[in-house]
């Protein structure tokens, strides 16, 4: 064993061993309990960032720990290769996106290997491989045949920068989730998958996800947005349009309905607009507002409306109800009806609209204590007791709902339904770099799937030029024009939303080389569901929703048996770093890398002045999420080259709880490296002392028992921290404390001392292995074990060692440690004082001093204060 710790040397050796022996490659073994650990699929953007490192280190710690428990552990890796960044890079460099993608994959693969992650590289997937996406195309056709796929022309979110459709989930604050460009709205034909048919299953399934974060489940519940309401048919007076179906959220307010409101896209609106120029103009102004409302972008817009000159009839009171078109009603809500019955006395939106256009307001609910509502300044929205409601007077809101519902059903004009905020998944994208949609258009206009025997429909290789940056597939005549049964047909030139590829990749990992189907059922059912999934909470209503949906689709066509894709989900927190900028002459913020900034701090450590490498006075913007936009990212390669992979892994897992934000401090990696060096040095000194004798359990002294107690208590704590609590930072803190305690307590005087130390060091190395596998591999070997640490089991606590009869007390004089004493575990304060006094009075320096105060911290320290 070398005297000094050189992390890069040992990491290369250990990684080569893992690579040569394919240590972490696995197959199905029904005699072993499986454990499938997976971190979310990375996009090959060119470089790993620290967010990647955190995600994958968490997964690797869990995987290695579970492997030491004797489980058959699958931890695969692959690449989410399609998407806009590759296409944008190809446009800039005038080349094919695959060149950029594969170059990035090679570099990022080297980065992952340099961190020592225990991946089964034989299962590596790349989603732009035709042998991967052929099964995605096949699956889409199966769903089409089952009636779960349809095509319709619809108003969509459109990103003018990327020239493509965005799903509702991909619109953030009115802008594209990638480039933040303000979205526009277009009507174009789109392919949809009926995720709404699975709304109940997606909602109810959340109750079975016991080990998912509540925040994620709440976000999904809200996105699915289940509510119960009633559709009621109203007759229309004096019109060739005879009826209208409207949505009513609260039937207890039914007797107070004073007008009806419909969306700008409602069929009645569009029909009347043909003969009403004012309404047609209103539609031209507001025809995108309702979809903005659906996307939660319409908060600050003023409510606008226009009267249709039509009246409906209240089916119970027979009151005439004016029908208005309003800009705040979405056609996508209320089961697609886009029409509501408005009771302004008891709904704030309706109240505001009624006041603006001087519409009738009829209160019909009073407070539960009988007080009449004051609706002068706002609506009264609480449930209560009905009045002003004919036969329903004096009923509570809850009771009235049932009575009014029965009345309307008896009249055969109402149907109570469950409604969802969730909309069908639009999967068409007007981009080149994606999976071709396997549909063709015949000469007679019929659209149908490509024959399954002709799959995959392979994306052609196209080089970008100035003339073909948009709709590049549609301009490729040789690809778009093909034949079917000896007739000319045209291919669909849209590609799939890239969330399609990432919705089923986890299942393909179970059988990546299977050529006869989408999944090999025995392998898929052996490994699935995933035991531990890891990724950011920002995916809660996009990837994690589609991921669950796809799993149920695959189950329902018989590919898999389980109901949910992952048993346990861990959402790691963001990584924050210092951020600096200066204002340029044109008033723009120029963000400066923290590596190029020199800062002056006050006594409290706060930054008071900063200058960059060019001499600019820069402004400290605080701790912000690491990002390219703020130029505050840290290159993992630079940290690995400077400190070694184990130190980086240690810091990432130690600096903060896994689910919390982590504040990046390079000094933290320096501290991790110092600890690993200390561990190396102590182990080196121990080994240099020669042969280790087997521990004699019958000749244990008090100090031995204390050390063994601490060691085996630490095993219990670290096991619980990693396994049940997933509190990895406290696990590492416990290991460090144990190491420090050993050094404090334990002078080495004889072979029994060395045997106890050997046991302690061996267990520390085992406990550290999931976190710092390279140094652990070498130290385990140097401690004399013939099997590699990769093949060892997790340490089991010796319960007898924990049940010690004595405890260690540190004796201090004026706060400085002088002695260690062992006292019976149940000793009272006076007994401990006497034993401690006898120990310290052996110190000649105390003879002329007077002890005037004794401070005792139970079971830890006794401190004698002298004059």
UniProtKB/Swiss-Prot annotation:
SUPFAM superfamilies in UniProt: Anticodon-binding domain of a subclass of class I aminoacyl-tRNA synthetases (SSF47323), Nucleotidylyl transferase (SSF52374), ValRS/IleRS/LeuRS editing domain (SSF50677)
Short motif 'KMSKS' region, span: 625-629
Predominant localisation class: cytoplasm
A cellular-component GO term for this protein: cytosol
An example Gene Ontology molecular-function term: leucine-tRNA ligase activity
Lineage: Bacteria, Pseudomonadati, Pseudomonadota, Gammaproteobacteria, Enterobacterales
Alphabetized InterPro entries for the sequence: aa-tRNA-synth_I_CS (IPR001412), aa-tRNA-synth_Ia (IPR002300), Leu-tRNA-ligase (IPR002302), Leu_tRNA-synth_edit (IPR025709), M/V/L/I-tRNA-synth_anticd-bd (IPR013155), Methionyl/Leucyl_tRNA_Synth (IPR015413), Rossmann-like_a/b/a_fold (IPR014729), tRNAsynth_Ia_anticodon-bd (IPR009080)
UniProt GO BP: leucyl-tRNA aminoacylation
UniProt short sequence motif 'HIGH' region, positions renumbered to this chain: 42-52
Catalytic activity: tRNA(Leu) + L-leucine + ATP = L-leucyl-tRNA(Leu) + AMP + diphosphate
Protein name per UniProt: Leucine--tRNA ligase
EC number: 6.1.1.4
């Amino acid at each position: 064993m070398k005297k000094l710790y050189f992390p890069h040397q040992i990491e290369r050796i250990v990684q080569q061993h893992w690579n040569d022996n394919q240590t972490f490659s696995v197959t199905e073994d029904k005699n072993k309990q499986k454990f499938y650990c997976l971190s979310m699929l990375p996009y090959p953007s060119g470089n790993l960032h620290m967010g990647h490192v955190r995600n994958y280190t968490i997964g690797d710690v869990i995987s290695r720990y579970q492997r030491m428990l004797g489980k058959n552990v699958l931890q695969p890796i692959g690449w989410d290769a399609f998407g806009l960044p590759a296409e944008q890079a190809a446009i800039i460099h005038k080349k094919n996106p695959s060149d950029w993608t594969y170059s990035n994959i090679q570099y990022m693969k080297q980065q992952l290997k340099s961190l020592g992650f225990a991946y089964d590289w034989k299962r590596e997937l790349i989603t732009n491989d035709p042998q991967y996406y052929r099964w995605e195309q096949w699956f889409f056709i199966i769903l089409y045949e089952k009636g779960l796929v349809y095509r319709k022309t619809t108003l969509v979110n459109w990103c003018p920068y990327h020239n493509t459709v965005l799903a509702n989930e991909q619109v953030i604050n009115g802008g594209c989730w990638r480039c933040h460009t303000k979205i526009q709205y277009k009507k174009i034909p789109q392919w949809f998958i009926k995720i709404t048919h699975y709304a109940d299953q997606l909602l109810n399934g959340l109750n079975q996800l016991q080990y998912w974060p509540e925040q994620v489940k709440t976000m999904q519940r809200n996105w699915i947005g289940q509510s119960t309401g009633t559709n009621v048919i109203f007759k229309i007076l004096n019109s060739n349009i005879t009826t209208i179906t409207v949505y009513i959220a609260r039937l207890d307010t039914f007797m107070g309905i004073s007008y009806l409101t419909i969306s700008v896209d409602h069929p009645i609106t569009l029909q009347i607009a043909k003969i009403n120029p004012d309404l047609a103009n209103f539609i031209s102004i507001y025809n995108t507002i309702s979809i903005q409302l659906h996307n939660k972008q319409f908060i600050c817009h003023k409510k606008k409306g226009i009267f249709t000159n039509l009246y409906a009839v209240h089916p119970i009171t027979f009151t005439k109800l004016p029908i208005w078109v309003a800009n705040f009603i979405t056609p996508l809500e209320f089961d697609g009806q886009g029409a509501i019955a408005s009771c302004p006395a008891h709904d704030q939106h309706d109240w505001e609209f009624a006041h603006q256009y001087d519409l009738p307001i009829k209160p019909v609910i009073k407070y539960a204590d009988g007080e009449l509502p004051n609706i002068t300044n706002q609506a009264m929205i609480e449930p209560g007791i009905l009045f002003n409601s004919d036969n329903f007077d004096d009923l509570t809101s809850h009771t009235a709902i049932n009575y009014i519902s029965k009345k309307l059903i008896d009249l055969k004009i109402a149907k109570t339904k469950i409604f969802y905020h969730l909309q069908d998944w639009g999967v068409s994208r007007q981009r080149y770099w994606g999976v071709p949609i396997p549909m063709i258009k015949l000469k007679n206009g019929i659209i149908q799937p490509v024959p399954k025997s002709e799959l995959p429909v392979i994306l052609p290789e196209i080089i970008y030029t100035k003339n073909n940056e948009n709709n590049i597939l549609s301009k490729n005549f040789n690809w778009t024009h093909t034949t079917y049964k000896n007739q000319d047909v045209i291919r669909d030139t849209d590609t799939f939303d890239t969330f399609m590829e990432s919705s089923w990749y986890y299942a393909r990992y179970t059988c990546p080389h299977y050529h006869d189907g989408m999944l090999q059922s025995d392998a898929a059912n052996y490994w699935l569901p995933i035991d531990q999934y890891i990724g950011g909470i920002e995916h809660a209503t996009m990837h994690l929703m589609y991921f669950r949906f796809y799993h149920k689709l695959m189950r329902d066509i018989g590919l898999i048996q389980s109901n949910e894709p992952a048993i346990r989900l861990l959402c790691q927190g963001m990584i924050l770093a210092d951020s600096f900028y200066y204002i340029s002459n044109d008033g723009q913020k120029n963000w400066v890398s923290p590596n190029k900034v020199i800062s002056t701090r006050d006594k409290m450590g706060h930054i008071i002045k900063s200058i960059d490498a060019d001499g600019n006075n820069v402004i400290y913007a605080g701790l912000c999420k690491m990002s390219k936009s703020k130029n505050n990212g840290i290159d993992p390669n630079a940290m690995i080259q400077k400190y070694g992979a184990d130190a980086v892994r240690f810091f990432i897992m130690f600096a903060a709880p896994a689910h919390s934000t982590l504040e990046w401090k390079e000094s933290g990696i320096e501290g991790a490296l110092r600890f690993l060096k200390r561990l190396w040095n102590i182990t080196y000194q121990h080994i240099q002392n020669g042969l280790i004798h087997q521990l004699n359990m019958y000749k244990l002294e008090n100090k031995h028992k204390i050390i063994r107690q601490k060691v085996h208590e630490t095993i219990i704590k670290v096991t619980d921290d990693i396994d049940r609590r997933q509190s990895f930072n406290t696990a590492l803190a416990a290991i460090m404390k144990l190491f420090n305690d050993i050094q404090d307590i334990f002078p080495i005087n004889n072979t029994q001392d060395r045997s106890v130390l050997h046991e302690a060091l061996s267990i520390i190395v085992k406990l550290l292995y999931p976190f710092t596998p390279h140094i652990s591999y070498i130290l385990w070997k140097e401690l004399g074990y013939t099997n590699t640490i990769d093949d060892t089991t997790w340490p089991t606590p010796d319960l007898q060692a924990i049940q010690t009869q004595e405890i260690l007390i540190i004796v201090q004089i004026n706060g400085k440690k002088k002695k260690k004493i062992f006292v019976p575990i149940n000793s009272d304060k006076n007994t401990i004082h006497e034993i401690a006094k006898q120990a310290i009075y052996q110190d000649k320096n105390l003879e002329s001093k007077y002890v005037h105060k004794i401070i005792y911290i139970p079971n830890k320290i006794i401190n004698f204060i002298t004059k």
